[in-house]
Amino acid sequence: SGPWMCYPGQAFQVPALPACRPLLRLQCNGSQVPEAVLRDCCQQLAHISEWCRCGALYSMLDSMYKEHGAQEGQAGTGAFPRCRREVVKLTAASITAVCRLPIVVDASGDGAYVCKDVAAYPDA
């Protein structure tokens, strides 16, 4: 297994991580996240291979923006009312850390907790 196995629809369902969407919407503007919301999101993420968790989070963020009419390179704020875009990206990138789920950041197998590619999402 490796990052090349992380195809959307195979490594994770599409749309990705539906249980993590409410978590992201709440967390990005500093709202309290109910325990059940956190648990559901972390459970969903835990079912995805550690190679593919960042890809799934990236796919989730991407689809949340695109559903609200954002094109590549221009962010729609409709997906995340009252949230700054850079906060949205960092919040999404940190969901693995919030859930304490390791990720594989590169082929050397180094484990980490924050998805750098998600934090660098190009729409913002």
Swiss-Prot record:
It is found in: Secreted. The disulfide bonds are essential for the inhibitor activity. InterPro entries: Allergen/soft/tryp_amyl_inhib, Allergen/tryp_amyl_inhib_CS, Bifun_inhib/LTP/seed_sf, Bifunc_inhib/LTP/seed_store. Disulfide bonds join C6-C52, C20-C41, C28-C83, C42-C99, C54-C115. Keywords: Allergen, Alpha-amylase inhibitor, Disulfide bond, Secreted. The keyword rRNA-binding does not apply. GO terms for cellular component: extracellular region. The keyword Signal does not apply. SUPFAM superfamilies: Bifunctional inhibitor/lipid-transfer protein/seed storage 2S albumin. SMART domains: AAI (SM00499). GO terms for molecular function: alpha-amylase inhibitor activity; IgE binding; serine-type endopeptidase inhibitor activity. It holds the Pfam family Tryp_alpha_amyl. Homodimer. PANTHER family: SEED ALLERGENIC PROTEIN RAG1 (PTHR34481:SF8), TRYPSIN/FACTOR XIIA INHIBITOR-RELATED (PTHR34481). Alpha-amylase inhibitor. Belongs to the protease inhibitor I6 (cereal trypsin/alpha-amylase inhibitor) family. This is Alpha-amylase inhibitor 0.19. It comes from Triticum aestivum (Wheat).
